[in-house]
């Protein structure tokens, strides 16, 4: 028995290719259950995948649940914002159940393992690739815990690249909720700069703004800007440009050959966006830079290297889970 625990939307996305493979396979795959919380609930409901919820006093509820289910392995997302993930790791350690979690995007490594001011690590951490591993170790995560697997969701979406759409996509992330003022900017300053630059180049009619499930749409009720709940991959299909901070939409946009930029006005910490940190897309901090960028043609020639790196991710995750379910 494997127990999957997901907190954020991207965590559910990471696991879904494996769940699909097992559901559609006639082979004797491991028995599994899913526990979902946070934004991942929306994802599993949309794909009609059943899951359990943990109610009541969280520590006692998790302890009771584990004593009933008795998994061999707990595989968790590492969202840094969902208490349930940490509680599962801590309770599993008490009763000797092996735990692993996975990195779904190249950012915020260390903060994923801090709970109430203390470091909390699973028995294993599944890294995306050697670059991810290197950055995690440099951030202070113990190398002995890390195993490179890949990113099954990104592998899947990179296999079929749709033609360019007609929109400029602005996906808003809940920066104020997750990071406060620590980055030097938030979703409001990101949006203000982006709107000014798009207006300068006369492309406001192409604009499409979406919000993360953790952002309250009522925040925009009295603002002169139209926003919609994000529809995930469909929003990127409909775009030719993705302007974000450090979101998954930017990674997919890059893989799909969209024009992508990381907009981080007043950034005062190490760049959390892998794409701009690695020099694959520009890091933009003012409206002049952004308006110049919006006048440039789409030119994304480096994406093949990232796509090639992702090949085999699902097979490696499947092999890992099969092995650990009988260990």
Locate the predicted segments by residue.
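Conserved catalytic-core segment of nucleotide-activated headgroup transferases in glycan assembly
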Residues: 13-21, 154-221
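Short, well-ordered alpha-helix to beta-strand connector turns
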Residues: 71, 121-122, 143, 165, ...
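Active-site and donor-binding regions of nucleotide-sugar-utilizing enzymes
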Residues: 3-157, 173, 215, 249-251, ...
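Short acidic-hydrophobic, aromatic-tinged amphipathic segments that line or gate anion-handling sites
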Residues: 52-58, 226-230, 279-293
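Catalytic binding pocket for nucleotide-activated donors in carbohydrate/polymer assembly enzymes
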Residues: 119-122, 248-310
């Amino acid at each position: 028995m494997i127990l999957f625990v997901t907190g954020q939307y991207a965590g559910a996305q990471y696991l879904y290719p494996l769940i699909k493979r097992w559901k559609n396979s006639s082979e004797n795959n491991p028995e599994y259950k899913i526990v979902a919380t946070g934004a991942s609930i929306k994802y599993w409901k949309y794909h009609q995948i059943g899951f359990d919820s943990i109610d009541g006093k969280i520590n006692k509820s998790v302890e009771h649940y584990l004593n009933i289910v008795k998994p061999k392995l707990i595989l968790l997302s590492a969202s840094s914002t969902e208490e349930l993930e940490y509680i599962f790791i801590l309770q599993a350690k008490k009763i000797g159940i092996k735990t692993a979690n996975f990195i779904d995007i190249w950012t915020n490594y260390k903060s994923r393992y801090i709970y109430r001011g203390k470091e909390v690590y699973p028995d294993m951490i599944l890294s995306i690739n050697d670059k991810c591993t290197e950055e995690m170790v440099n951030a202070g995560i113990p190398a002995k815990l890390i195993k490179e697997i890949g990113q099954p969701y990104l592998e899947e979406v990179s296999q079929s690249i749709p033609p360019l759409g007609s929109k400029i996509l602005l996906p808003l992330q809940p920066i104020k909720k997750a990071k406060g003022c620590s980055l030097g900017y938030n979703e409001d300053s990101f949006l203000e700069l982006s709107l000014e630059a798009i207006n300068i180049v006369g492309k406001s009619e192409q604009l499409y703004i979406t919000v993360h499930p953790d952002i309250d749409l009522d925040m925009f009720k009295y603002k002169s800007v139209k926003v919609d709940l994000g529809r995930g991959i469909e929003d990127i299909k409909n775009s030719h440009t993705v302007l974000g901070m450090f979101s998954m939409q930017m990674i997919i946009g890059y893989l799909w050959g969209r024009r992508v930029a990381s907009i981080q006005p007043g950034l005062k910490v190490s760049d959390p966006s892998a794409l701009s940190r690695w020099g694959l897309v520009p890091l933009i901090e003012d409206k002049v830079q952004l308006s110049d960028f919006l006048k440039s043609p789409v030119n994304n020639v480096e994406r093949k290297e990232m796509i090639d790196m992702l090949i085999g991710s699902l097979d490696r995750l499947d092999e890992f889970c099969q092995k650990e379910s009988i260990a």
